[in-house]
Amino acid sequence: MALFVIGLNHTTAPLALRERIAFAPSELNHALPELQNSLNDPDDTQANQPPAQLAVLSTCNRMEVYLSHAHEHKHPERAILQWLATYHDVPLSELTEHMYILQGESALNHAFAVASGMNSMVLGEPQILGQMKQAARIAFEANTMGSELRHWFEKSFAVAKDVRTNTAIGE
């Protein structure tokens, strides 16, 4: 499975754009399955390929789609960008100008930095870990969190705990 993070944050996008593409937690129960369906190829279902696994972290300072996808070569990041632009009625060109796309080890390292507060506007702020846990719970409830993505999130939570325990971050 290929791991991706597609998103924007306080360093890449102005507040006005972040507000336009933010999701309310209650909105994600419907939006996550819709996004998952847009990523799943009907041929994959027939070939017993696993569906895309995804979660969305949406806060005042960031919106990120965390994705575990079976087909690295199919460029799911393009489909996600198009879906986000359509869903939020934002021109694709405006959205892509401010988005980042991370894959593999870079995506995993980013998740570790976010969970531990190292990628926050205020270094070490503790709320982000709770927000990531909420994103994982919502994805689980929406049935878009599979074992691969769950493992990725659990590893991020463990790294965040280690960072808080073994460093002075957030003090």
Mark where each language-model region is.
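Glycine/serine-rich phosphate-binding loop and adjoining beta1-alpha1 elements at the start
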Residues: 94-171
